[in-house]
């Protein structure tokens, strides 16, 4: 395994650890999710480029589309929660309150 793949896997693990540790604020959770999606995108792109597997060349673009949709939904949820409660604490998101 090359050094580039090790660095990308380390970036993914750091973002995952950040998501697990800093889950009190919604903004930090969204940033960690974006870091995870970015590292997955780079890993998929490098793997497809190195293996010359042209049939799967659309997979990184599809992953990028899902990351953009996730970011848009996350930011709209952040705006709604911060306008409603005044803070971005995840503990304010209770599905039973509706």
Curated annotation (Swiss-Prot):
InterPro entries: NADH_UbQ_OxRdtase_chain4L/K (IPR001133), NUOK/Mnh_C1-like (IPR039428). One of its GO terms (molecular function) is NADH dehydrogenase (ubiquinone) activity. The chain crosses the membrane at residues 1-21, 29-49, 59-79. Keywords: Electron transport, Membrane, Mitochondrion, Mitochondrion inner membrane, NAD, Respiratory chain, Translocase, Transmembrane, Transmembrane helix, Transport, Ubiquinone. It is a multi-pass membrane protein. Signal peptide: none annotated. It comes from the Eukaryota. It catalyses: a ubiquinone + NADH + 5 H(+)(in) = a ubiquinol + NAD(+) + 4 H(+)(out). It is found in: Mitochondrion inner membrane. GO terms for cellular component: mitochondrial inner membrane; respiratory chain complex I. Its EC number is 7.1.1.2. One of its GO terms (biological process) is ATP synthesis coupled electron transport. Core subunit of respiratory chain NADH dehydrogenase (Complex I) which is composed of 45 different subunits. Belongs to the complex I subunit 4L family. Core subunit of the mitochondrial membrane respiratory chain NADH dehydrogenase (Complex I) which catalyzes electron transfer from NADH through the respiratory chain, using ubiquinone as an electron acceptor. Part of the enzyme membrane arm which is embedded in the lipid bilayer and involved in proton translocation. This is NADH-ubiquinone oxidoreductase chain 4L. It comes from Rusa unicolor swinhoei. The gene is MT-ND4L.
């Amino acid at each position: 395994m090359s050094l580039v793949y090790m660095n990308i896997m380390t970036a993914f693990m750091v973002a995952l650890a950040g998501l697990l540790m800093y889950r009190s604020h919604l903004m930090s959770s969204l940033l960690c999710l974006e870091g995870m999606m970015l590292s997955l995108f780079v890993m998929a792109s490098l793997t497809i480029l190195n293996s010359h597997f042209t049939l799967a060349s659309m997979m990184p673009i599809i992953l990028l589309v899902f990351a953009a949709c996730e970011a848009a939904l996350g930011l709209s949820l952040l705006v709604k929660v911060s306008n409603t409660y005044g803070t971005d604490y995840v503990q304010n998101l209770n599905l039973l309150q509706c």
